[in-house]
Structures are given as structure tokens and as C-alpha cells.
Amino acid sequence: IVVGSFGKTFHVTGWKTGYCMAAPELMKMFRQVYQFASFCAVTPVQMALATFMQQHPEHIEELAGFYQQKRDLFNSGLKNSRFQFTPSQGTYFQNLDYSAIRPDLNDVAMCTFLAEQHGIVAIPISVFYQQAPENLRLIRFCFAKKDETLQQASAILSAV
């Protein structure tokens, strides 16, 4: 089963439109559940995405390079920071290890600290665990942003 969103792929995050692909027998069940889980789809948005995909098939082919440039821009701004990281692959999120900065804070507290003290928002990695490791000191940033936003964010983070 593949479930995804068109939001970041086509730079329309506010459209809240996604997709599901699976074997026919699973899709039949999915459609039955979806019928009651969602009131209605936004047909004009679906049509706009379908038209764009037909008219611009190259968009998907260029996407990896587009996001690699975004990742590299964000990460290059963090080179002189105290955050540790391995450049991400296959995603538009970058995890940062902050254990050299505030090892006393868990990831939720670190995200709160960054938001309240520095005006920058991160996602705690622990939300993706049923039971996170106690020493987890990772936070996540999305680099599917404007270049100016990435430069500003990396400058703020480098000063932490």
C-alpha cells in the first residue's frame, strides 16, 4: 500500500489532496472506508492536479534535484552550527541532533525552547515512536520552503 500527498510534490500544501495505491482488492476496501471518512473531495483541485501532471510530466523527474538543492542550501547554512546531522536522502526533511547544545532537554522541550526563544519551529522525532528512546535528541525540519526561509532558519539555528 502506498499513501501519499500531492502537497509538497506539486508545491500546493494547502490543497490537502493525496492518493492511495494498492492491489485492487485492497483499493475496494479503501474506497469503502474513504466514503465514510471524508465528506467530499475538492474536485477542482483534483482536476487541476491531473491537468498539471499531464502537461508537465518532467516535474516529477526534476523533483529530486529540486529538493536536493533545498537540502544542500539548508545544510550548508548549518555547517558552522553545533547541530550534528547526516544529509537526508529521499525526503524533504532533515533531522538534527542537538545533543551538543541542550542535552538536558528532551525533543519536545527542545522544540518548545526553539519556538519560544528563537521563533523557529521543529518537529520532535519522538512523535513518530510508540515509545521513544530516552536519550533521543533529534528534531526534524522540513526544507520544502522558500530559499529565503531556509537561509533565515539556518542562520537562527547556527546562533543557538
Q: What function would you assign to each model-found segment?
A:
Residues 1-160:
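PLP-dependent class I/II
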